[in-house]
Amino acid sequence: MGGLRRTSKKSINLGWRNASFRGFADYMQTTEFFEGLKELNILIKKSHRVAIMCAEAVPWRCHRSLIADAEIARHVVVWEIMRKTSARLHKLTAFAKINRNKRPIQIYYP
């Protein structure tokens, strides 16, 4: 689910000024992303806890925050681990929009 993604010319995620975040948000509209999210949720159901890690130390500088938004849209509780002894609940990105009428549930950033 990770990695640098290119933005689409038909992007619906123009709220992201950062091209790499917009590219990942565009990727979040694909079948490949939804399949990865489905696998992640199977792991969550089996173990009740899953950690997603990346090179960036803080979630708001990483695509993990977008994955967390997608999970929140599906009513999954997401904790951001800041340090060994510090965690906080992830809050949906302020300009995110959720379309629960579409299946799978769509999240985008206009």
Predicted regions and their residues:
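Residues lining hydrophobic/aromatic ligand-binding pockets adjacent to catalytic sites
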Residues: M1-P110
